[in-house]
Curated annotation (Swiss-Prot):
Protein name: Uncharacterized protein pXO2-44/BXB0049/GBAA_pXO2_0049
Domain of life (superkingdom): Bacteria
Alphabetized UniProt keyword annotations: Plasmid
Length: 100
């Protein structure tokens, strides 16, 4: 499960780089990146300390956060980045059920 956490973090950094590479990110884009970062805040600590219970909680928080987002509200150039991120994260999080 820890390698999934690392991959989720990597995908998040790619999203942030892509969103902030535009001069006009848009209010919703910035807000959504902040919400994603808030959901992921403790993942590095949970991985480092091997706290699988907390890691699972953080994965669920991220899933809930992504489900509440309306990607049509972000700046047009960022819509594909958010959609790709959400799809990739869902794919990664489904892996954790296969590992159990």
């Amino acid at each position: 499960m820890h390698h999934i956490g690392y991959e989720v973090l990597q995908e998040t950094f790619v999203l942030i780089r892509n969103v902030f590479s535009y001069s006009n990110q848009g209010e919703y884009s910035v807000t959504y990146v902040r919400e994603i970062a808030d959901a992921l805040y403790n993942i590095p600590h949970s991985i480092q300390k091997q706290h699988d219970t907390f890691l699972e909680f953080e994965f669920k928080l991220l899933e809930e956060t992504l489900m509440q987002m309306e990607f049509g509200k972000v700046a047009a150039q960022n819509i594909p980045h958010f959609r790709m991120y959400a799809a990739r994260v869902q794919q990664l999080l489904r892996k954790r059920y296969k590992e159990v």
